[in-house]
Design a protein with these regions (language model features):
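Long, charged, low-complexity intrinsically disordered regions
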Residues: 1-112
C-alpha cells in the first residue's frame, strides 16, 4: 500500500471553481414535456436560484437525439425563453466536461 504522503497530487486550476455552475436543472430526465411545462419548470428553478443568490447555473437539456425528428426541442426553446428575461446576462453551450451540446450554462444578474 502506497503512503498517502507520496501519492501524486491531481493538478487543479485555482480558477476552476469560479467557472463551475452553482446549481443545475435536468430537463433531460423529465420525460415528454409541453412548452408550457418547460417554461413553468424553468421559472420555478430560476425563482429558487434568485432566492438563494445563485448567479451561474447549468440547464441539462439533452441533445435531442431521441426526439421525433432527431433534432433538439428543449434546448432551443429554453435558450430563447431565457434570453427574453432581462436578468439573464448570458446563455451559452456548456463545456464538454459538463455535457457540452446537451447543456446550457446561464449567468443571471438579478435586480437587488
Amino acid at each position: 500500500m502506497a503512503n498517502k504522503r507520496f501519492q501524486k497530487k491531481k493538478k487543479t486550476n485555482k480558477y476552476d471553481n469560479l467557472s463551475k455552475p452553482q446549481a443545475e436543472f435536468d430537463f433531460h430526465d423529465r420525460g415528454a414535456l409541453t412548452k408550457h411545462d418547460m417554461q413553468r419548470l424553468a421559472d420555478e428553478f430560476i425563482e429558487e436560484c434568485r432566492d438563494r443568490g445563485l448567479t451561474k447555473v447549468l440547464f441539462i437539456t439533452g441533445k435531442g437525439l431521441h426526439s421525433k425528428h432527431g433534432m433538439p426541442v428543449i434546448k432551443p426553446f429554453i435558450k430563447k425563453y431565457l434570453l427574453s428575461k432581462s436578468f439573464v446576462v448570458r446563455v451559452y453551450e456548456g463545456r464538454f466536461d459538463r455535457g457540452g451540446s446537451g447543456t446550457l450554462e446561464v449567468i443571471f444578474d438579478f435586480p437587488a
